[in-house]
Amino acid sequence: IDSAIVATIAADALGPENVRCVMLPSEYTSQSSLEDAKAVAENLGARYDYVPIKEGRDAVTNTLAPLFEGREPDITEENLQSRLRGLLLMALSNKFGEMLLTTGNKSEVAVGYATIYGDMSGGYNPIKDLYKTRVYESGRWGNENHRPWMMEPAGEVSPVRVIEKPPSAELKPGQKDSDSLPDYPVLDGILDILIDQDGSIEDCIYAGYTREDANSVEH
């Protein structure tokens, strides 16, 4: 949904003919994600490129194998995928003179659920001030509303499945954001108190959130 909203914002501002959508799948990318990414690009009328990361990932994995020998796979291997995607996208940006837009929402950036030199690579982030719940709201609003200044086609751009399916970075089997973070309505409510209202843990508890959730978000 983050990528879909960023693509939509770019198409609205610049025209879909000036937007390039790039899908960079791995073996952990679900079939539904492949279908949804292509659908968003087609709905917008934007260019769609398909760039698998397997060969690059295999090369990096083999290069590091002697150094990583005896150590269990962990978040390092997950971040390799994100950073490889960032490298490939920056190469496209460099070659074709196009600005790479990043897709990290305010919720992810606030709690560090993003990868430096990975999905944070790029020249501008259109959704940097949107919490994840606002991203979902924007997707629903965009499907139902159109304004004369919008350069994207009217109608449904983000398929309902994109908005409704559990969010996942898809960097390992069965991964969901909720494995590492509180549900986004909870996370965003706590972040709003701690960041936007400059509140405290006690303010979060007073608002109805658990101390455990508030402490986990703060740290």
PLM region descriptions:
Residues 1-219:
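ATP/NTP-dependent adenylation/nucleotidyl-transfer catalytic domains that generate, transfer
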